[in-house]
Amino acid sequence: MSMNNITSKMNQDSYGYFQLHMSDFTRVSLSIVFTLVFLVGIIGNAVIIWFIGFKWTKTISTLLFINLALADSLFLIFIPVYTVYVLSNFHWYLGEFLCRVSSFFFTTNMYASMFLLTFISIDKYLTLTSHRLVYKYRKYRNYYVCIGAIWCISIALGVPTLYYKRVILSSSRNETRCISYYGDDKHTAITIYRIIVCIRFIIGYVFPMTVILLSYALIVYKVKFINKPPNRSFMITTASIFVFLACWTPHHVLNIISLYGLKSTSMYNYIKESIPFVNAIAFVYSAINPIIYIFVIRLTSTYDSDTMDELRSALLDEETTSTEDCSDIEISDISR
């Protein structure tokens, strides 16, 4: 359906698509935050990808972390698009292709980051508690398949965003917006919106968070009995998961609130005006991961040590530990 047909078939003002306006100070402040997040994130993740991908020994741990950095980078490269949108007071001038693709990447890489963190949590638990299973299945081929499946699922979950995003023109206000358009019938549109929000909340937040919390609870329980302190790779993952939840929880909470606020004009306006601020918090996660790595390494290293060498050692420590643990398994046990 063309943009003109969409314009003629829906009463856009009744949906509230074109009432979002901010003060110049707020828009400029948000744009500065987005710009800083973009610069810090792109540089930081590029450094991580460069060292892990091209300088260091390849291990399963580095394979997981480089995919996490890749997901963050793909998320970050479209932040300038959103920054322009905010600076232009939410008038969309960049065409429908960028409207669809930027939203698709935001959604896909949100899922990819969460699923990768979930997979890393499961990997940490199995590495610590199931030596036979690790010895048998912790192979590159198996992990490539799992990571490939994570990306395929994330892309599939991002397809609805790609499909429903539209550039909508208001002839009465002479404004354009990049919005999710679910059809002319309001009841159908609200139903589709609620389904998408519920899928995003359950599959992209509740289920992964439950698996992560369960994995870490079991890890803590196990550590109490084996009297073995967590390694630095475990600490890095824990910090990254904590920050992810802190940054993305407001986004999901706001989406759930929106399910109950669609019939209230005041609540709808509050939700709509909160979106840029909630997005700003979510964007921070993709930029802060490299800072988390450095922060944890500096806390656990000597003052004069090289940060990147220490990070490399932290990721390799887990591989060494896993190998040593597996070497304790008797050959008769392996052959069963």
From Swiss-Prot:
Annotated localization: Host cell membrane
Gene3D superfamilies hit by this protein: Rhodopsin 7-helix transmembrane proteins
Main location: host cell
GO MF terms, alphabetically ordered: complement receptor activity; G protein-coupled receptor activity
Ranges facing Cytoplasmic side: 53-63, 123-143, 222-240, 298-336
Superkingdom assignment: Viruses
Transmembrane residue ranges: 32-52, 64-84, 102-122, 144-164, 201-221, 241-261, 277-297
UniProt cross-references to SUPFAM superfamilies, sorted A to Z: Family A G protein-coupled receptor-like (SSF81321)
Family according to the record: Belongs to the G-protein coupled receptor 1 family.
Protein name: G-protein coupled receptor homolog FPV027
Lineage: Viruses, Varidnaviria, Bamfordvirae, Nucleocytoviricota, Pokkesviricetes
